[in-house]
Amino acid sequence: MGYYSLTEITAVQYAKDHGYFEAKANVVCHEIGDGNLNYVFKLDDGEKSIIIKQALPYAKVVGESWPLSIKRATIESKALQIFAQYVPDYVPAVYSHDEELAITVIEDLSRLTITRKGLIGGEEYPLLSQHIGRFLAHVLFYTSDFGLQSEEKRVLEGTFVNPDLCKITEDLVFTDPFGHYDTNDYEPDLQLVVDELWSDKTLKLKVAQYKYKFLTRKETLIHGDLHTGSIFSSPSETKVIDPEFATYGPFGFDIGQFIANLLLNALSREEEKRSVLFFHIEKTWSYFVETFTKLWIGEGVEVYTKEKQWLPIILQNIFTDAVGFAGCELIRRTIGLAHVADLDEIENKETRIQAKKQALSLGKELIKYESKSADIQLFRTLFQQTVSGGVKA
């Protein structure tokens, strides 16, 4: 039959045909996706529920003028299954994958809340940083040359060649926000600040280096889009979703993206309500380092992991990259194609514009920063130096 796009009606029929529900079951189906690239359906018969996710052959946010390969659905499914090998508690269960229709049937996580939405609403998620730090340490270690035999890593790397989605990252994170491109999207009130950013040659030289790292450093399997909208949370659970951007890339990329999105939420808050975000930023790194170090010592397969002075060098390199990647993410989420609700939903226009100017300034500082030690307090320090006051209540 070939590929076709599901509707709420055909999604129910697909689920019944594949044994998820009885033929006579009264299944309620709603399209719940709010992302840019896929359809997401929730199906529930009152006793059990599932999620059906289908990749579209184009970017939903733009339309059919932006074609995309549906093979990204297979990459996403494989990534979730690999993550589950190392950190099953931190990803949804994958029930099945249909490569022809680009459909993945996965666990319903409706008991949880999208982390971005929860943080905007004032939730604190006390275990978020512990869970994400450990998730990152396990996945990044075990899919790298440190935790995987080199020949196995090369085979795995080949299964995550993801040109369409990598091109989106190359353009929307590292290129378009730093020049005159049609994809950019920002308020006219930001034009002077944007012009200054675009004319900053020192900044562009640093961004060029971070883009080159993303293009060339195939160090480990990265999620590729690890922001707070790609995580479900509750006070006791954390689940990472949507790794359709998964590819082999730099160790620091996912860490930087996650931290940047916590910073974006901090920018949207009153000053006295920001401390929980810095707690999570700092604890994410400390849990990552603690877990990565244990794995390095106990599970390392690369012979030189026995050299005691190498691990600090690796961690310093990861941290340096994370700082720069965080800066790029701050800028692209402020003036690029895909914004974040943390800033866009600030009701007062003057306050919103000020927060976005601060995001751009902080992004520039992070990109330009020359870190000499892996001091996670850096994010708090640069934030305080760059941002004065907070959003007014």
From Swiss-Prot:
Q: Where does substrate bind?
A: D225, R332
Q: In which pathway does it act?
A: Amino-acid biosynthesis; L-methionine biosynthesis via salvage pathway; S-methyl-5-thio-alpha-D-ribose 1-phosphate from S-methyl-5'-thioadenosine (hydrolase route): step 2/2
Q: What does the record give as the reaction this protein catalyses?
A: 5-(methylsulfanyl)-D-ribose + ATP = 5-(methylsulfanyl)-alpha-D-ribose 1-phosphate + ADP + H(+)
Q: Where does ATP bind?
A: N38, K53, E107, D108, L109, D242, P243, E244
Keyword Ribosomal protein tagged: no
Which Cys residues form disulphide pairs? Answer: none
- UniProt cross-references to InterPro entries, sorted A to Z: Aminoglycoside_PTrfase (IPR002575), Kinase-like_dom_sf (IPR011009), Methylthioribose_kinase (IPR009212)
Assembly and oligomerization: Homodimer.
Of which family is this protein a member?
Answer: Belongs to the methylthioribose kinase family.
Q: What does this protein do?
A: Catalyzes the phosphorylation of methylthioribose into methylthioribose-1-phosphate.
Alphabetized PANTHER family for the sequence: METHYLTHIORIBOSE KINASE
Q: What is this protein called?
A: Methylthioribose kinase
Q: Which organism is it from?
A: Bacillus cereus (strain G9842)
